[in-house]
Regions:
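N-terminal glycine-rich phosphate/pyrophosphate-binding loop and immediately adjacent elements
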Residues: 2-130, 416
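Glycine-rich phosphate/pyrophosphate-binding beta-alpha loops
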Residues: 54-61, 181-185, 285-287, 344, ...
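Mid-domain catalytic core of redox enzymes
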Residues: 231, 237-349
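Helical element adjacent to the flavin cofactor pocket in flavoenzyme catalytic cores
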Residues: 198-240
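Rossmann-like flavin
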Residues: 92-191
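A conserved FAD-binding loop/helix module that cradles the flavin
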Residues: 443-469
Length: 470
């Protein structure tokens, strides 16, 4: 009987395992950490009872994922919760760009820029599932929705700073630029509009929800579904050589490419090993968790209701800071993402103490301390927040890499998002999941479609393995 082993119990490893198990393949998942989840783990990092997401926090692509939507994970305890305001981007003037799930309400809030917002996002939202069905697959495939893909591609190929010229107000331009900055790539480069378009449209199509009880609920539900299908998960098992798993007919590796090359050793063709070791990792995150009494006192009222905030000032300021981190320098005012998941999910708080999530974009492997720079950015738009902080927990890039080995140098996107690598990750190949070793596949976020808690990397890789078994 065909047997499969999955190395790594992050969302993509579990997605691969579930996909194989659905086809009757016995699956064992081996996870080095004491708990499953990879980047979706949730911890009481600051004070007992306060739930902080360790990395992945807000999930616009999860509800859009064809794989996750097919599983009915709510049956296994997953509950999605939405904040009143999905995203806010405050400016020094006291105003803010505000993303709501309603396209019309968002456009209305942008005033004179509302019609242009509708023109850009209306068609994409109307055909969002068709676009997702294309971009969540490998680049080399026969499109089922070519017109929808083409319409998306026209804008996606542009630098974010160029596409943003369709809006005149600082609020609309900053709102789009902050979302585009999720790509960890200079906004004046080609293809940076793609992230901004996809995540903003996801907000209008599905919202930017959080998982009740923390992001761990997503992978806990995946694990429950796998167990229901007869799969097995073993934690605290570090796989250090291919020989430990070579007995399996199918091996799925939820690993960074360099780690996969090291694991497979001489079994991997030299040309593939060279490509994997040359795989480029991008800038890092510097993350802090805060316990804040009474919440963050944002100057802008919409920010007090927002589940996610982007702190970086104007589009031009964000473009400058992203350029700086790519040059290896920490800006005085780095781009910061703040999560207030407790607004949608009060179970994460204890009384008047609330967990606040924040990370800054910093250079790859940044060895310094960005804690005060992050708090300064929050204070910039919420004067007095320092006095409300009662506890903090810090994860530097090196500590993020220790927490999750796929985050090489603190790169939580599991790879640089330059256009060539986005198109051809993790190497030039007809099958991006094949490692060159028979029966062994890479299924991490280093494969298409890339980062995000959507499980599609694992799903696609498992589908590749199943085709080879036929």
């Amino acid at each position: 009987m065909t047997e499969a082993v999955v190395v790594g119990a992050g969302p993509n490893g579990l997605a691969a395992a579930v996909t194989l198990a659905q086809q009757g393949v016995p699956v064992t998942v081996l996870e080095a950490a004491a708990t499953i989840g990879g980047g979706t783990r949730t911890s009481e990092n600051t004070l007992p009872g306060l739930l902080h997401d360790d990395c992945s926090a807000v999930h616009p692509t999860s509800l859009a994922s064809p794989f996750l939507r097919s599983l009915d994970l709510e049956r296994h305890g997953l509950r999605w919760r939405w904040p009143e305001v999905d995203l806010a981007h405050p400016l020094d003037s006291g105003s803010a760009g505000v993303l709501l799930r309603s396209l019309d309400d968002t456009a209305a809030g942008l005033g004179a820029d509302g019609p242009a917002w509708r023109r850009v996002f209306g068609p994409l939202v109307a055909h969002y599932d068709d676009v997702v069905a294309e971009v969540f697959r490998p680049v080399l495939h026969l499109p089922r929705h070519p017109l929808s893909l083409a319409r998306f591609g026209v804008g996606a190929l542009l630098p974010a700073t160029v596409l943003a010229r369709v809006w005149r107000s600082a609020e609309a331009r900053a709102l789009f630029g902050g979302v585009a900055a999720h790509g960890f790539y200079p906004l004046r480069r080609p293809l940076t509009s793609a992230v901004g378009l996809m995540l903003t449209a996801a907000g209008h199509a599905y919202g930017w929800p959080v998982a009740e009880g923390g992001s761990r609920a997503i992978t806990n539900a995946l694990a429950a579904r796998l167990t229901e299908l007869g799969g097995t998960i073993k934690t605290g098992v570090l796989v250090e050589s291919y020989q430990e798993v070579a007995h399996a007919d199918v091996v799925m590796l939820d690993l960074a490419p360099g780690a996969a090359a090291n694991l497979l050793g001489s079994a991997m063709p030299a040309r593939v090993a060279k490509a994997y070791r040359r795989y480029r990792h991008g800038p890092a995150a510097f993350k802090i968790d805060l316990a804040v009494r009474g919440g963050v006192p944002w100057t802008n009222e919409a920010c007090r209701r927002a589940g996610t905030l982007h702190l970086g000032g104007s589009l031009e300021e964000i473009a400058g800071t992203e350029r700086e981190i790519h040059a290896g320098r920490l800006p005085k005012r780095p781009f910061v993402l703040v999560g207030q998941q407790y607004l949608a999910d009060p179970t994460r708080s204890v009384g008047d103490l609330h967990p606040v999530y924040a990370y800054a974009h910093v250079p790859h492997g940044y060895p310094g301390d960005a804690t005060e720079a992050i708090i300064d950015q929050i204070e910039r738009f919420a004067p007095g927040v320092r006095e409300r902080i009662v506890a903090r927990f810090v994860r530097r890039p090196t500590e993020l890499a220790e927490y999750n080995r796929n985050y090489v140098g603190g790169d939580i996107a599991t790879g640089a998002n330059d256009p060539l690598q986005v198109a051809l990750r993790p190497r030039v190949a007809l099958d991006p999941y094949a490692t060159g070793v028979a029966g062994v596949y890479l299924c991490s976020a280093a494969t298409p479609p890339g980062a995000g808690v959507h499980g599609m990397c694992g799903f696609n890789a498992a589908r590749s393995a199943l085709r080879a078994l036929r």
